[in-house]
């Protein structure tokens, strides 16, 4: 919701609760905590209670991804070296050009996979099938990809590196971990 619409929307909700005895359920994947936000002030006088008791504990238990931002840019060669050091890793880059620049750092005989829209759908499916089998078998899998893997692709790597980009894309990449 655009920030400028929050106050008027909450005013309408408060009016519905106070004047018409309406019950309002706020539900979102990223709901802010009421204790730490202006929502508490905006909804003054309304009874606010969590439907799920101990929700913070649920988040802690389900926390499975660690985000790290590198303090300095990494060269393509340094990135390739990091990929080589890992048993199973996926690197997601923003452009096909960037993916190819990283791939250029590898010798032809090195075991590296590539996915992007430079490949036709049939070839991408074939590569994905091979990757799935190798991940399941615990074999080495090093994948350099574009954003093509961020939606509609079921991959589960122990480690994912993502080029800086919009937050929703970074979160999407974390879903591949």
Question: Which residues does each PLM region occupy?
Answer:
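Generic beta-strand/beta-sheet core signal
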Residues: 1, 25-27, 92-94, 115, ...
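Loop/turn-to-beta-strand initiation segments
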Residues: 19-25, 88, 139-142
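Interdomain hinge/linker at the junction between the two RecA-like core domains of SF2 helicases
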Residues: 15, 19, 30-85
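Conserved RecA-like helicase motor core of SF1/SF2 enzymes
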Residues: 112-125, 130-132, 140-177
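Short, conserved "post-DEAD/DEAH" coupling segment immediately C-terminal to helicase motif II
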Residues: 2-22
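Conserved strand-helix element at the start of the C-terminal RecA-like helicase core
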Residues: 82-107
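Short glycine-/polar-rich loops that comprise or flank the Walker A/P-loop
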Residues: 20-22, 61-65, 109-111, 155-159
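Conserved nucleotide-binding/hydrolysis micro-motifs of P-loop NTPases
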Residues: 24, 30-34, 71-75, 96-99, ...
């Amino acid at each position: 919701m655009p920030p400028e619409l929050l106050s008027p929307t909450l005013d309408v909700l408060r009016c519905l609760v106070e004047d018409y005895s309406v019950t309002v359920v706020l539900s979102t994947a990223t709901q802010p905590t009421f204790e730490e936000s202006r929502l508490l002030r905006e909804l003054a006088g309304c009874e606010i209670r969590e439907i799920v008791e101990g929700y913070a504990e649920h988040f802690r238990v389900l926390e499975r991804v660690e985000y790290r931002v590198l303090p300095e840019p990494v060269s393509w060669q340094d990135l390739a070296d990091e990929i080589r050091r890992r048993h199973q890793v996926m690197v997601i880059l923003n452009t096909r050009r960037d993916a190819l620049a990283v791939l250029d750092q590898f010798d032809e005989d090195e075991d590296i996979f590539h996915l992007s829209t430079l490949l036709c759908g049939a070839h991408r499916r074939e590569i994905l099938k091979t990757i799935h089998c190798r991940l399941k078998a615990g074999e080495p899998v090093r994948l350099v990809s574009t954003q093509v893997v961020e939606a509609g692709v079921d991959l589960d790597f122990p480690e994912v590196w993502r080029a800086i980009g919009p937050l929703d894309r970074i979160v999407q990449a974390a879903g591949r971990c």
